[in-house]
């Protein structure tokens, strides 16, 4: 019972599937289509799905009933998953900024034990991704769709240090040595 309360939150369901995927309902919206006889109501759902090991995706589904909209959104999220390299399996390799429409998010790597410091829809993305330590700031639009898409834009630009070293044409060990001196200088 205490476990259920801890993972709760307004409008956010967490469900683990038998295939190891975790999905979270980020936002549900009631929409209306005006027809000759009046209004025809439907629902739109935004769902984030991840394996908590570095793969995450989001999906949007629309239907006349809520469960059907959630099912469609979940299927859409599973089709469009991305892989995000994590440092020590818990945080980002480097700070990054993402944009989508009027939404802007800033994601920063954090020390172990920091936790997920993020608001609203971004928290759902990080929890399903399997990230444990991150500091995120949302600027601009607070629309959940824009926030999720901006977060994914930022996560897609995340690079593993080996890829950075290859792009710069230097050895990975040289890059790690530079990073070690930079971290020592900060402390």
UniProtKB/Swiss-Prot annotation:
GO CC, one annotated term: small ribosomal subunit
Top-level division of the source organism's lineage: Bacteria
Keywords: Ribonucleoprotein, Ribosomal protein, RNA-binding, rRNA-binding
Positions in coiled-coil regions: none
Annotated InterPro entries: Ribosomal_Su5_D2-typ_SF, Ribosomal_uS5, Ribosomal_uS5_bac-type, Ribosomal_uS5_C, Ribosomal_uS5_N, Ribosomal_uS5_N_CS, Ribsml_uS5_D2-typ_fold_subgr
GO biological process: translation
HAMAP family given in the database record: Ribosomal_uS5_B
SUBUNIT field: Part of the 30S ribosomal subunit. Contacts proteins S4 and S8.
Protein's name according to its UniProt entry: Small ribosomal subunit protein uS5
Organism name: Mesorhizobium japonicum (strain LMG 29417 / CECT 9101 / MAFF 303099) (Mesorhizobium loti (strain MAFF 303099))
């Amino acid at each position: 019972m205490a476990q259920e309360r801890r993972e709760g939150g307004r409008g956010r369901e967490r469900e683990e599937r038998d295939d190891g995927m975790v999905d979270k309902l980020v936002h549900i919206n009631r929409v209306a289509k005006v027809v000759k006889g009046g209004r025809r109501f439907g629902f739109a759902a935004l769902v984030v799905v991840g394996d908590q090991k570095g793969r995450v995706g989001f999906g949007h589904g629309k239907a006349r009933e809520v469960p059907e909209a959630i099912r469609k959104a979940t299927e859409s999220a599973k089709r469009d998953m991305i892989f995000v390299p994590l440092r020590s399996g818990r945080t980002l390799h480097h700070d990054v900024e993402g944009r989508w429409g009027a939404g802007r998010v800033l994601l920063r790597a954090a020390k172990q034990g920091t936790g997920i410091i993020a608001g609203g829809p971004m928290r759902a993305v990080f929890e399903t991704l399997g990230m444990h330590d991150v500091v995120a700031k949302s600027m601009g639009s607070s629309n959940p769709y824009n926030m999720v898409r901006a977060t994914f834009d930022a996560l897609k630009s995340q690079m593993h240090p080996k890829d950075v070293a290859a792009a710069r044409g230097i050895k990975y060990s040289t890059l790690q040595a530079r990073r070690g001196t930079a971290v020592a200088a900060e402390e």
